[in-house]
């Protein structure tokens, strides 16, 4: 009877229920085509010197950084993201034991520190190595990169928003109060405070020193508590301290905001964005990051993270960062309409690359309403020799002036204005001149066109490329490959919210997901005989 031994702490005391069988090697228990073998072999080919540099010392008889890297990549492949769940798998799953090579399972804190303190430092370097290895294997083309972006929620707490508009408004009110307060102090205590356009923190500190000097000279003793009357000087100093703290707070928040319009108090790198996952259908903003994927031959070859909600300003930093890390350069850039801008067109051209970017008006330009809209420049007759447009009524719109406008990224665009000298009595006036909010009466208004010649030229060239047979195939592959990578991450891998706070940690998590997905994709291609395939062909009707 072993019943009395079941309640003992040592469960091996009733091991007669289990017969130990030889061999004990895990190598025999794991199938030859299991992806865990591919993970191990792939990581062994990588140079992890940058990862090892992040460690001061590595203890013996513990899992090495290379082994932990294998663990977290394989965990991502199997939708395991929590450090505690990874540790549990290391104790129960023979595939994880195979990667540990007989070493004890690392603690959950060790795994969390590995991701946040060590892997995050060299995450881009390791992703670049994986992309270079795939290129050497002939698995990626190195010619065409498909780019797309999505938003993933950060690990910030709810309702921790800080809005730039509210900060600037409150700061302006504070400056008004400070001007009155400084003038009042000058009148009460006979002092002089010198400042230029606006009162700064340094100005308030100098004023505080002057008031403290008066306190010492007059021997004023500050009092506290109920029933004790404060002097005017004490009230002024306490009010000054409150103003000083508020001004410091607003200055710090504006510095944290940078060129953003919002951030979260508990994750200052995250920006509030409108997400597609809106359960309440009220357009609620959530702290998130804009993740950019560069996909080639179904593999994620590069990743970048941006605080900007829109994709337009993310393309140039993405391409520069990718070129600095990868050992090869892409010649074709394929992206959707969210990336179209004059600045992006020019950068891609100057960088020796070809743009296949879907114009923002591509879909609407195919509609009947768009083609019959006489107010649009595209539906007017253009004379290049005179640089003028002829409207529906046969009147000529000539160049009147040029204006320069600066975008949020600092790019300067030149806009040319075309104006009709007289639209009086035109029967098409109400159809041609838009905008009902103008204060000028309709009968006194004339037709004006604002045209960016550079943008129009680059868009026309790009439209010709994307409507060709090759361009159509690239657009189809962008939909399949780039958008498919986010479908894999969000749906198949069930990753919709970051576990670690901070931009660097969020990027590290995204790169771990990408590396895990790439190994899964390589395993799938090997087993189905699709290795070396780059593009999906167009379907013929």
Where are the predicted features?
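Anion-binding and metal-coordination hotspots
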Residues: 2, 12-13, 72, 79-92, ...
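Basic, short loop/linker segments at the boundary and entry of helix-turn-helix/winged-helix-like folds
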Residues: 31-73
């Amino acid at each position: 009877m072993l019943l009395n031994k079941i309640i003992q702490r040592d469960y091996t005391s009733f091991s007669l229920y289990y017969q130990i069988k030889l061999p004990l090697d895990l190598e025999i228990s794991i199938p030859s085509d299991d992806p865990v073998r591919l993970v191990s072999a792939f990581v062994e080919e990588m140079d992890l010197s940058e990862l090892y540099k992040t460690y001061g010392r590595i203890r013996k008889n513990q899992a090495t950084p290379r082994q932990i890297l294998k663990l977290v990549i394989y965990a991502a492949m199997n939708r395991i993201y929590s450090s505690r769940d990874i540790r549990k798998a290391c104790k129960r799953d023979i595939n994880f034991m195979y990667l540990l090579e007989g070493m004890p399972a690392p603690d959950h804190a060790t795994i969390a520190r590995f991701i946040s303190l060590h892997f995050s430092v060299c995450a881009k370097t390791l992703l670049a190595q994986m992309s270079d290895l795939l290129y050497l294997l002939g698995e990626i083309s190195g010619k065409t990169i498909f780019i797309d972006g999505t938003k993933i929620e950060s690990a910030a707490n709810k309702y921790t928003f800080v809005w730039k508009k509210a900060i600037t408004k409150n700061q302006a009110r504070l400056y008004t109060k400070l001007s009155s307060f400084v003038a009042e102090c000058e009148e009460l205590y006979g002092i002089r405070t010198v400042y230029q356009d606006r009162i700064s923190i340094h100005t308030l500190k100098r004023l505080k020193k002057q008031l403290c000097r008066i306190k010492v000279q007059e021997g004023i003793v500050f009092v506290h508590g109920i029933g004790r009357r404060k002097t005017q000087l004490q009230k002024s100093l306490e009010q000054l301290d409150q103003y000083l703290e508020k001004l410091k707070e607003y200055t710090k928040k504006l510095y944290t905001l940078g060129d953003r319009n919002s951030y979260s108090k508990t994750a200052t790198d995250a920006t509030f964005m409108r997400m597609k996952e809106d359960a309440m259908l009220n357009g609620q903003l959530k702290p998130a990051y804009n993740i950019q994927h560069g996909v080639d031959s179904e593999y994620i070859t590069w990743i970048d993270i941006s605080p900007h909600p829109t994709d337009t300003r993310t393309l140039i930093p993405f391409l520069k960062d990718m070129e600095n890390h990868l050992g090869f350069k892409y010649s074709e850039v394929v992206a959707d309409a969210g990336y179209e801008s004059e600045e992006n067109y020019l950068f891609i051209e100057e960088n020796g690359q070809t743009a296949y970017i879907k114009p923002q008006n591509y879909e609407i330009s195919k509609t009947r309403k768009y083609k019959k809209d006489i107010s649009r420049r595209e539906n007017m007759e253009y004379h290049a020799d005179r640089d003028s447009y002829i409207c529906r009524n046969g009147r000529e719109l000539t160049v009147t002036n040029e204006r320069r406008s600066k975008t949020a990224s600092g790019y300067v665009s030149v806009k040319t204005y075309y104006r009709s000298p007289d639209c009086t009595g035109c029967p098409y006036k109400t159809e041609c001149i838009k905008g009902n909010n103008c204060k000028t009466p309709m009968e006194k208004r004339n037709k004006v066109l604002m045209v960016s010649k550079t943008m129009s030229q680059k868009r026309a060239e790009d439209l010709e490329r994307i409507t060709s047979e090759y361009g159509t195939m690239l657009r189809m592959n962008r939909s399949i490959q780039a958008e498919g990578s986010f479908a894999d991450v969000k749906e198949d891998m069930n990753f919709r919210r970051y576990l670690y706070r901070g931009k660097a940690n969020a990027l590290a998590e995204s790169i771990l997901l990408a590396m895990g997905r790439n190994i899964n994709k390589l395993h799938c291609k090997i087993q189905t005989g699709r290795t070396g395939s780059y593009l999906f062909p167009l379907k013929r009707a």
